[in-house]
């Protein structure tokens, strides 16, 4: 059962995961407006970076409207209460990028790896701790390994110095039982002082439910975003999550009405593609595909005259993971070739 006396650490990701929804094009003005609203509403941290983390701006992932440091500096100069967080994927961002983000005002960092590759986070976690940052391990695509194996990876991150480790449902393939099993496995091996967190997506409409189940199984921190602004069908919608836990009489420290207003008045008008469950975003969850593949897959489908749904299902069959965005075009070309051969045989 959830401890009603325990304060939930509310981690907003509108200005990082939400970058995916608008192709990393937040203006500084929009970033400041969102950060100010979140800060006033009482969230604990506000994550800021390119959608793929520090140094993610690239041909492979898409170029940002601004640099990570420009966004971080703007938000850090705005907030009065919330901590500024950022994300780093080893192999994309470096310790030099992390130092620059720290100097720009970031005080929380989430070091993200694939769920079976925690060992590549050692250098970055140790460096973050040396800076005095609140250091979090972030195990992406957590559905792709067993609860026990995931817990071993979490234990590695803890051994490097991570103060919190997350179950990250990047592929949106976890149901409530899956979430419960992973947090129970974490609890069995992690030091009681090490916190745990949940990063949910909403492609199967389970973002809020999975986050609440995580809390029921000892989770300390929950990620969410205004309107669910994020990759795929988005993250757990922050305003919905807070409304739900408020009705449960759980401690969250946020103003529900302010979050609802910020979601509707500031964030929703920025969406060039509605962040919702639809044919394409549902396909991501159904196939267990990395949520940030959405916009890349839609572009490939339009270019080659294919179904985005079919491409995503094939990506799922091939067990593609984050960082393999370049393979989306390869898969599309394979499917195009197969269709042409089928047409020739039919003729």
UniProtKB/Swiss-Prot annotation:
Pfam families: DmpG_comm, HMGL-like. PROSITE patterns: PYR_CT. Mn(2+) binds at residues 17, 199, 201. Residues 8-260 form the Pyruvate carboxyltransferase domain. Coiled coil: none annotated. The active site is at 20 (proton acceptor). The keyword rRNA-binding does not apply. GO terms for molecular function: 2-isopropylmalate synthase activity; 4-hydroxy-2-oxovalerate aldolase activity; manganese ion binding. The record marks 16 as: Transition state stabilizer. It comes from the Bacteria. Substrate binds at residues 16-17, 170, 199, 290. It catalyses: (S)-4-hydroxy-2-oxopentanoate = acetaldehyde + pyruvate. Belongs to the 4-hydroxy-2-oxovalerate aldolase family. This is 4-hydroxy-2-oxovalerate aldolase. It comes from Paraburkholderia phytofirmans (strain DSM 17436 / LMG 22146 / PsJN).
